Amino acid sequence: MKKGCLENTNNAHPKNFGLNSSGRLEWLDFGKAMGILVVLLVHAGCRLGLVTYYGGMFYMPIFFVAAGYTFRVKKGESYGTFLLKKAKRLLIPYFGTSAFLWVFFWVKDCVLGGTPGDLKLASLFGILYSRNQMWRGGYTGSNPVLMNVLNSPLWFLTALFLVYAWYGLISKVKKKYWLLGGGLAVSVIWHYVTPLLLPWSLEAVPYFTVFFAAGEKLKEWGGVKTLTNDIRLGIACLNFFLLLGFLSGSVNLSCGNYGVSMLLYLAVGIFGSYTIFVIGDRLEARCPKIMQVFELIGRQTLPILCLHMFLYMFLQTGAGVLGLGDGLTKTVMVVGSLVVLTAVGYGWEYVNKRKRPLRP
């Protein structure tokens, strides 16, 4: 997930965008932290009623919206250079993490199991295909899990890369919104014509790009302060989110399930993301100490996304050895992953900074 930094291009005071003294967008980091927290809760198997139900309404769209808010192409930067930067940011973690997990389970299951010749080709295919399954949820035929080495959350990285690729291509075109709408129509038609899920979420990328565009539009409107300065707008976002989310039903974007309507869920995801951002902006003013914790987590959503399932395996095993109950085990999995992987993320940043040569 892209770091919550924003270049002020409108000659406005940074506080009008919700920037703190370090140039961070704390409410944006809060939104990403809330999104990754719901990811952890869902993947740990937590069932918290309305919390996980409504959390499931925004926890993936909010990352697309946040990425759209921070989207920019530097003046004079070529499309190829832009794509290369996004590939380094998203595809290197994707293939690096996937390769690590594949090697780990190949050694664990095959080498130590006495069958080193078994190269887990199905797992390699899943890594290249980058979808949890080939057919939409509910498909009655054979539909095996493709990303089966605890790498299932990583589908998001390839999808976001293609969203950047598509939006970067159309962003400078005068008929950008026509192309955006046309792409959305293709996604919707594909969804209702065939249950086939294409590699790298190709059939869904134009759909996800609408969430991305909603993030950029929020920036054009003046940022989250536009919603918090007029309380009626913030309340309207919340009410639309709660009502439309109730009507939408459960979703699972990784499996191509959008609830009762793809278009309805677009509104749910956008209003839900805006609502979480408003809450973050309010907390920033009223509970700065709490926001500092969320900011720490929100800046490290990439390592948490990539490795939490792997860490879950060890935490769950350890909890079983200690005889912990189901509820306490899930708590250990969620909290332990947040603490350990946030620390890992900052440790990795520190090492990289030490490697960089000092500027003269």
Description of each model-found segment:
Residues 1-360:
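Alpha-helical transmembrane segments and their immediate juxtamembrane cytosolic regions
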